[in-house]
Each structure stands twice: as C-alpha cells, then as structure tokens.
Amino acid sequence: NEDGEVKKADMFYKQTIKAKTVIDRVETAVEALNVSVNEFGYVNLAYMLSIYEPDITNAKEELAEKSGQTVDEITLSDDALAELRRAVLVEELDGLIFLNPDRYNENNPDIGWETADEYLSGNVRDKLRVAKAMAADTGNPQAEKFAGNVAALEKVQPEWIEASDIDVKIGTTWIEPLDYEQFIYELLNTPRRARAVRSQFYNTGIQVHLNKMSMEWFIENKSMDKHSVAATKTYGTSRMDAYSIFEDTLNLKTVTVRDRIDDGDGKYHYEVNKNETMLAREKQNMIKEKFKEWLFSEPERRQKYVEYYNETFNNIRLREYDGSHLQFPGMNPAIELKPHQKNAVARILLGGNTLLAHCVGAGKSFEMMAACMEQKRLGLANKTIMVVPKPLIGQTASEFLRLYPSANILVATERDFEKSRRKQFVSRIATGDYDCIIMSHSQFEKIPISAERKERMLNEQIDEISYAIDEMKERNGERWTVKQMESQKKKLEEQLKSLSDESRKDDLITFEELGVDSIMVDEAHNFKNLAIFSKMNNVSGISSSGAKKSTDMQLKCQYLSEINDGRGIVFATGTPISNTMCEMYVMQLYLQKAALEEMGIYHFDSWAANFGEVTTALELTVEGSGFRFKSRFNKFTNLPELMNIFREVADVQTADMLNLPVPQAEYINEVLKPSETQEEMVSSFADRAEAVRNGNVNPRFDNMLKITNDGRKLALDQRLINPLLPDFEDSKLNACVDAMFETWERGSEKRLTQLFFCDL
C-alpha cells in the first residue's frame, strides 16, 4: 500500500476468478439450446446433439409404419441416424428456433437456425416476404418448414398505420417529383401552356426535379406562371411568388424576404424585410396545409404512399434481449452484474452495433468490459480497443482487472504516444493477442485511417457531384446551383491532391492494419460534433462544421461496419441527445448507416424531412433588448417509427427505469435586481448586436459569441467586465457567497462539505 506495507492478495484467501463450467450432458432440448447460445452465441445444432440425446423412439416407429417393418427390423446408416436425431431435436424446439431463408444452406442442414427472439424481430415485413416466397417453392424440401415461419411472422407484424397518423411534409424525398408537380398545378391552377411536356426531343414547362447527389429540389421554368393571381396574391406575394415559396419549402427552408440597402461607394448589404417576410411565411404555411389535405385525398395516391410508409418505416419489431443465461467465465465471482447489465451484454453479443444510452451509475463500464471478454471467448471479435476519456484510463484499467483478474489488457500511457514511442506501441497492438487495448480519445485519433480509404471516399464524392453537375447542365439548371456544386467539387479535388502529396505521419501502421475488429467508446457524446450538410441555412441546431476527431471516428466506424456486417461498434453515454435533435441522426450515422440507406435516407435532409420539423418563433435576442424571429430544428414528427428505428441499436436505461438510489434535489432560483451600471451595459449590448447583424463590424473584434459571453460575465459580477467598477452589494457573486456562508454555518458542527460549481 502507500505506506509500504505488504500483504497477501485476495487470491490467497478467496476465489477471484469464476471457473468455466464445462457442460457435457443436459436433459432437455431447451437446456441444450440455452447452453449453445451461452457457449457460441448462436444455435449450434451439432454441439447441441453432442450434449443432448433426443428420444427417437416415436420417429423410428413412424418409419417402421411407413415401410411395413417392425422397429427392430429398421437399420439406419450413421448419416441417416444423425439426420433423424437432428429432425427430432428441431421438432422438440418447434416455435423456439426457426430456419432463416436468407442463411439457409441446403448442403449443410446445421446452418441458418436462429432463436425465435432473433428471427421474429428486426425488419419482419421483409422477412415475411422472403418466407412466403420460400414456402411457395414446392421444389424446396424445407417449404413446409418455411410455411411455419410465415405463420409465426404474420403474428408479429407491426400494426398498420393509416394515412391520418402519417405526417408527410413538403420536401419528403420519397414523394415522387411528378406528384409534387401535380399538387402545385392543381393548387395554382397552372395554365396548360406552362405545364410540363416531356419527350425524347425536348422538355419544357414548369417541372419539379430532385438532385440525387445534393438531395436539393428545384423547380425548372417557374417564371412561366409567376405573375398569376394565385402565384402572387392567393398563395404568394408581390415580392415572392408561390412557385419560389414552394421551392424553398421543398428544400425545408423558412422563406425570408430581404431588401438591398446601398451603403454608397458601390457597396451594399441586405436586411430582412420583416413585414414582407411575415406575409410570405403566412403563404408558406397555407401551402403546407393545402399539401397535407391534398396528398391523401385521392384513393390511389393514398394507398401508394401509405403502403410505402408502412413497408419502409413501420417494418420493425424490437428484440427483447435476455442475458440471464450468460455465465461469464473468468469474471470475479464477488461481482454480480445486475439484470439490465446482463441484458445489455446480450444485446452487444447477439445484436449488431450498440448504443448504451444508460444514465450515470447504471454500470456502463462493466457492461462493455464483460461484453469485450465474452465476444473474445465466443469468437465474435478478435481484438477490441476501448476508447475512454484521458482522465479515466487508469481507473478503467484497474476496474477491468477487478472484474476480470486474469484479463490480458494493454493500457496506453502518455509516454506510449510520444512521437518517438508511438510507432512501437502501435506495433504492439498489431502483433499482440490482447483481450482489450485501452486508450484515450486523443490517442485513438492519432492512429491514422489509411490514405487509400480517404482517397476512395473523396473520389466517390467527386464522382457523385460530377454526375449531378452534368445532370443539372443537361436540364439547364439554375446557374447558382451549378456554380455551388462546382465550387464544392473543386474543394474535394484540392483535398484529394493534398492527401496524395502528404506523406504518412510517423509512417504509422494504419487502423485497418491493426487487426482491430471491435471498438468500445466510453463518453461517446464527445464525438457528436460531426459535420452535417444541409440545404437548410440559418437554422439553429444544424451545424455544417465538425470536429476532426468526429470525422476520424466516422471513417473508422464505417470500416468496422463493412468488415463485420453491421456489428463491432459499441458507444456508451449518459447523454446521447443533449443539445439538438441532429445528435440522434449523428448517432444513427455512426451505428446504423446501412439501415438508414435501406430506407432511402442517404442525407440529413431526407432524415429531417421524415422525422423533424423547423419551427419559427419570436425569441428574446442575444443581448436581451428585444425579440426577433428565430428558426430552430426542434420538433420531432413520426416519432414512434423513428424511435423503433433508433431502438434497434439503442439500449436505453434511465434512472427511473433502474430505480437508482438518487436523493431528491432542491432547486432554488435567486432573483436579483441589476445595478444601474449593469442596465446601461445591457443597453450597449443591443447596439453591438445590431452592428454585428448588419455586418458593420469585423468579426475578429466583435461577434455574437463575444456579446453572449460578456453578458454572462456581466450577470455574474460587473467587475468581470471592468475590474475598476465598484463591488455591487447585490451581485450574483455576493449572493452566492452569502448563501454558501449560511450553509457552512448550519453544517459547521457536523463538519459538512459543500460543492460549488461555476460555469465561467
């Protein structure tokens, strides 16, 4: 210990490692199934038959009856006997295991079996389609077995959602462009001369198009009917016609009308025309409401889109994971995981990528450690890196060895990632056989993803954008859109050239060369700052700038999902969604990108059109001097379906669900009056903010962030703005000191302790 005293370790007095129990015989088929799942993580018929002897008496009697022989006269070859034993075992487990048609192999009858909770979950609509096709194949020897699948799957289909419960907004990408065209024609009574004409010789008329690369909608030739009464008065304004409003709405934008203000000397700036903007937004809301009424009004169109929505988004049955059968050989027997922890481990082992969205104190660290050891034992993962915040490396390592005393772990120290030692340490990861490698977030980022993977990603983006540019030019798309895409293409090409010219730093082994096939990321919310590219601009909650470490994490997650078919990634955080709705999309992008793409969601705007909504409301200005309109992406739509998709990867456990022993907090809000100096300074903030909005000040000298920060400092104590100002007796700081002193006096007899937090 710290005093230099030596004593015998716990292993001298008690068992510190749970021995592995070897089971060589069970009495029932169900027991054999449980042991198989515990030992291998799946239904292993060959293993089950090695520990369980099914009673084949009745089966032999049926054979005798069919052949006209007695039971004693029947002789079976070894292969025939093995097949009979397998058939009896499968029959005994009828309803508990199913043969998955997607994994079925007619040459190996042991392959493709799944437990009921696995097979009867996930995309059950797609599974039902496949099962029906296989059951209808009369030439398939397993057709009867697949008919049983059909019956079981039909019982677990999600309840059909009717049109009245589906929220479809303008801009939803699975609504066909021709239907958007038809809507605007009917709404504005577009004259026939201005309607679309498509032929192999020419295209003309007002047409709605979707750029598949940028997912940007544009209306071609909208000027052909921009002066009609419907376009300029009923559903539009003199400053913004209905076609332009509809185009902005398709692109999820809140319409804004701006006036050009001349500053002299050939300079000018734009200011929002509040009255015209309010009028245009009123027309925009009218168009939105009319679209909702129109979309499902025609029976054939209603059936088409209701079926699409149910087949695409309402197709999931969530799986209930039960970890009660797990034995955890090698774990410290003095530690017993709680039921929710065992279930979380089962989810990681039996499911795919996982988000442990558990509250503080739920035991996420032990869940990841146990899952790490179990997936190594079961052969589900060969090498796992556990990524934790830098201050927690030592604690994580000691907790790991407390849970698994004989674990072979490699722990990265600060010295290991110094430039002179980094290559040696990374080589140890590549060449060693470790149960787990523990390192910090920043150290993980220093292990490079291969230049080839980065180049491939950039080339794919360049190819996509080149195709989109060609498509736009063929359709005579708007020049600003083409120019914008060409600028984006140029930036990508510069990145590609920079990547080609850059020599690999330290000549390190790349992430792909390490042999790592699993990562577990603690405090994963630190990687939520991933760049989101969206057509929506000036909308709070959407950021197009991202952190480098988040991009690095995304590339590594994509690699692991590719080699593991959607597994191998575990994120753990108590705050998966804390600031904006976009954080849910980011988590889905890390963990279930392929699932989103199966639904046709390749971009954030597609996700936002299905599951979110931008709201505009009056809000107090940053400087607190008045109100202004603010657009925020802050409202969920079609939430039940979104949560079903999200819960496929997310294991959510709140403090209320776990009934954790957390004491009730008493919140006290102190209301204080400002000093005269503070009031004067708040007024000056309004002038500063107006100057920033109008672009009259260099952002290096003043900006909204600086004004906000000055406001926070002023609210705490005016001397934080100017140390020469007097100490205001009723300041927040003084009120806090008085409260702390009063609390200290009350607890001085018992020598109680206070914790004080200040976010400045």
Question: Which residues fall in each region the model found?
Answer:
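Charged, low-complexity intrinsically disordered regions
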Residues: 1-315, 381, 405, 429, ...
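Conserved helix-turn-beta segment of the N-terminal RecA-like "Helicase ATP-binding" lobe
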Residues: 391-418, 424, 428-431, 591-595
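Conserved SF1/SF2 helicase motif Ia
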Residues: 360-362, 367-398, 404-408, 563-568
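Inter-lobe coupling linker of SF2 helicases/translocases
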Residues: 422-469, 474-476, 480, 487-518, ...
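Conserved pre-motif I regulatory segment
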Residues: 315-357
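Walker B catalytic acidic pair
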Residues: 522-523
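Hydrophobic anchor at the beta1->P-loop junction of P-loop NTPases
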Residues: 356, 386, 572
